[in-house]
């Protein structure tokens, strides 16, 4: 809905389940809004290498991507330099890249921590998988959208989907497989 070229580039750190599921969730949402969209995907095999991330993003932009999913730092810098848009990840970097960050998928780790600490406090703690509490349905995630950059119909569709996730009428498919490029 925002991409004019129908090509979105995605640069990730490592192809691990926690990263893969974020990328797949974004891909599913983008495809729901625009069934013609295709993806270019690359992993850096590094958690922090902004120059490498930037070069990967430049290559994707040169291959036609006009929106970048910035799972790593450096990607939004490439988007700024080439006049493209980006989606942020984990934290909201819109103030660092004004006019570039369409939205950021935010992680609220407090929901997970509160659940675990609450279980310790009430004596019910067990070694368990608390990862579900990092999901939007449990207030572990949200979106920060720049409404000046994202069309109103897209903002409305996102708000409706977020409400459906929170009330349980839509369940996000968790896909831990490594995402790959469409072309």
Where are these regions (language model features)?
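A residue-level marker of the well-folded mature domains of exported/periplasmic proteins
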Residues: 1-183
């Amino acid at each position: 809905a925002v991409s004019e070229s129908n090509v979105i580039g995605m640069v990730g750190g490592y192809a691990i389940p926690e990263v893969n599921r974020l990328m797949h969730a974004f891909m599913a949402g983008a495809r729901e809004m625009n069934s013609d969209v295709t993806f270019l995907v690359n992993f850096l095999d590094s958690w922090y290498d902004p120059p490498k991330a930037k070069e990967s993003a430049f290559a994707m932009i040169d291959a036609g991507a006009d929106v970048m999913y910035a799972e790593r730092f450096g990607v939004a810098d490439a988007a700024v330099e080439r006049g493209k848009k980006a989606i942020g990840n984990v934290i909201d970097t819109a103030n660092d890249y004004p006019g570039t960050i369409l939205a950021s998928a935010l992680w609220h780790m407090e929901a997970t921590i509160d659940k675990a600490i609450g279980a310790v406090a009430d004596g019910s703690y067990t070694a368990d998988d608390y990862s579900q509490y990092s999901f939007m349905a449990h207030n572990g995630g949200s979106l920060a959208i720049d409404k000046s950059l994202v069309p109103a119909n897209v903002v409305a569709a996102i708000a409706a989907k977020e409400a459906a996730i929170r009330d349980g009428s839509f369940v996000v498919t968790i896909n831990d497989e490594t995402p790959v490029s469409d072309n």
